[in-house]
Amino acid sequence: MSESLHLTRNGPILEITLDRPKANAIDAKTSFAMGEAFLNFRDDPELRVAIITGGGEKFFSAGWDLKAAAEGEAPDADFGPGGFAGLTEIFDLDKPVIAAVNGYAFGGGFELALAADFIVCAENASFALPEAKLGIVPDSGGVLRLPKLLPPAIVNEMVMTGRRMSAEEALRWGVVNRVVSQSELMESARELAQQLVNSAPLAIAALKEIYRATSEMPVEEGYRYIRSGVLKHYPSVLHSEDALEGPQAFAEKRDPVWKGR
């Protein structure tokens, strides 16, 4: 594993810290390591939730390492499994990822956060996609994911001018889930992670699968699709031990014991 990444397992929760002073910028080597970490998370049955954060208090990630670019690393270089930053192109990840944004999330750093399922950010965090000012485009998900969250006028301003969005503005638009003080950031992310652990893993996998499959469908078509039998997790949930355990635990006034089957 790259020395730029620190991995910490807290039971079913994996914490990934990107630590590349000064700006936690990501070159191809680091991106490969991040991809390996996220794929291992995906495939490890003992892990339920991942938290990705940046080292320090100023930068979550400045995105693509422009020093590496100046030394010849191409914008379309091979950034490894999972695409840039290891997460932006993992399309079969059925476990939740929380981005704990501790500072500036610019370019690919913002795209990394957008690829997560939840964003918890510090009050000093800000977000931007300045690629057009560098002669490139935010093609690691920014130009695809941001329009699903914001009105076209706001998206156009951000991607065409590189305008920054503050943490509070991101919260107002629903881009992030929570804004907390820097000192409370990881505590808040861990609290959210534990809430996710308390939910049934098969149910969460089914929810992510359904979102992916039906997000562009009309509601009626979505109903037909999820009941057609083509999905992997949804039918499994309906006939799982966990589907029996949940109501039984509720009736017995105890916490459920999830088996993931």
From Swiss-Prot:
Keywords: Lyase
Active site: 111, 131
Catalytic activity: (R)-carnitinyl-CoA = crotonobetainyl-CoA + H2O
GO aspect biological process, one term: carnitine metabolic process
Protease recorded as keyword: no
SS bonds (residue pairs): none
Protein EC: 4.2.1.149
Pathway: Amine and polyamine metabolism; carnitine metabolism
Uppermost EC category: lyase
SUPFAM superfamilies linked to this entry: ClpP/crotonase
Gene3D superfamilies the record matches: 2-enoyl-CoA Hydratase, Chain A, domain 1 (3.90.226.10), Lyase 2-enoyl-coa Hydratase, Chain A, domain 2 (1.10.12.10)
GO molecular function: hydro-lyase activity; L-carnitine CoA-transferase activity
Pfam families documented for this protein: ECH_1
Domain of life: Bacteria
Family classification: Belongs to the enoyl-CoA hydratase/isomerase family.
Cited function: Catalyzes the reversible dehydration of L-carnitinyl-CoA to crotonobetainyl-CoA.
Protein name: Carnitinyl-CoA dehydratase
